[in-house]
A protein has these predicted regions:
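N-terminal segment of the mature folded domain
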Residues: 22-151, 328-329
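Bacterial N-terminal signal peptides that target proteins for export
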Residues: 1-9
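Short helix-loop capping/hinge motifs at secondary-structure junctions, enriched
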Residues: 125-131, 150, 163-171, 248-256
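Extracellular/periplasmic juxtamembrane helices and adjacent flexible linkers that interface
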Residues: 249-332
Length: 332
């Protein structure tokens, strides 16, 4: 993972130098563990844009906890596109008038080029025997997961844990008892997904990491045998939508480039890149072609199976005064 961080530093330096000579520059504001995906997408899209449009294009990237990133855009971060962890963060920007209300309908599959889920990363040999969500509440199991108030990984992990009870017949009372026990065994809440990875991998804190599926694959690959990937029987279907930031692209006159960029995500080439980075492509043919990467045994439940919609889940579970606020006691 240290090597991964070093590669990212080099990539950011190269991106900065290329931006200086660009005719058009886009800023993609995304959630935390998507750096490698977007760098690869950009490397393929930029030459095509030059060939078809004749303009030199540069694409800058900004990454952090998804909710934190949404707040940054609201506060003035000049994003041309946002590729955040869920509809709730994009809607937060739309509610401030920066994105038009019909944004979900602009692109195929409700502006969803891929989807993902939350899985477990454990120490070599899985010494704590972690196979399913109830195992996380066993005495002596330390869980690493980001803060659900700031991170898409964080709130999706909370929703997944909650849903693992509700979708299998448990009551809300059962779910509250479960997440209370689980979060009492979380030693630290990092602000974003990549910070949680650092805590688990480099600092060697915790027995299990609740991670985005793509991040889990990266961790295991970089660890070279020291970590294992565990798919629980059920988890949440995570849907990271993409959108133009209308107010910014119109002011900067970058709408055409930004639209072309997002439309490219639905091409077969981009869908293959998405699969290569362990995200589940929305194109069924590409998904089937890469079936070996994505186990079919895990049941992915929709947020609508635990609440009326994403906004309702957010309000009830992690909003101010919600379940998380009542059950979580920070470690001192």
């Amino acid at each position: 993972m240290t090597r991964l961080v070093s590669k990212l530093a080099v990539a950011l330096a190269l991106a900065a130098s290329s931006a200086a000579a660009a005719d058009v520059t886009l800023l993609n504001v995304s959630y935390d563990p998507t750096r490698e995906l977007w760098r690869d997408i950009n490397d393929h899209f930029i030459p095509q844009y030059k060939k078809t449009k004749g303009d030199n294009l540069a694409i800058k990237q900004s990454h952090g906890g998804s909710s934190t990133q949404a707040r940054a855009v609201i506060d003035g971060l000049d994003a041309d596109v946002v590729t955040l962890a869920s509809v709730i963060d994009t809607d937060a920007i739309a509610q401030k008038g920066l994105i038009t209300g019909d944004w979900v309908k602009r692109l195929p599959s409700s502006s969803l080029p891929y989807y993902s889920t939350i899985v477990f990363v454990v120490r070599k040999g899985n010494p704590k025997g972690i196979k399913d969500w109830p195992d996380l509440a066993k005495p002596g199991v330390e869980i690493v997961t980001p803060n659900p108030k700031t991170s898409g990984n964080g709130y999706l992990s909370f929703f997944a844990a909650w849903g693992s009870v509700i979708t299998r017949g448990g009551s809300k009372k059962d779910a509250v008892a479960y997440v209370t026990k689980l979060y009492s065994q979380v030693p630290v809440l990092d602000s974003g997904a990549r910070g949680a990875t650092t805590t688990f991998v480099q600092k060697e804190i915790g027995d299990v990491h609740l991670a985005w599926e793509n991040e889990a694959h990266l961790e295991v690959r970089e660890a070279k045998g020291d970590l294992d990937l565990v798919y629980p029987p059920v988890s949440i279907r995570a849907e990271p939508h993409v959108a133009l930031v209308d107010a910014n692209v119109d002011r900067k006159k970058t709408r055409a480039a930004a639209e072309a960029y997002l439309k490219y995500l639905y091409t077969d080439e981009a869908q293959e890149i998405i699969a290569k980075h362990f995200y589940r492509p929305i194109n069924d043919a590409v998904l089937k072609k890469n079936a070996a990467t994505f186990p079919a045994g895990i049941k992915l439940f929709s947020v609508k199976e635990i609440a009326a919609d994403f906004a309702a889940a957010h309000k009830e579970l992690i909003g101010t005064g919600g379940v998380f606020d009542t059950i979580y006691k920070p470690k001192r």
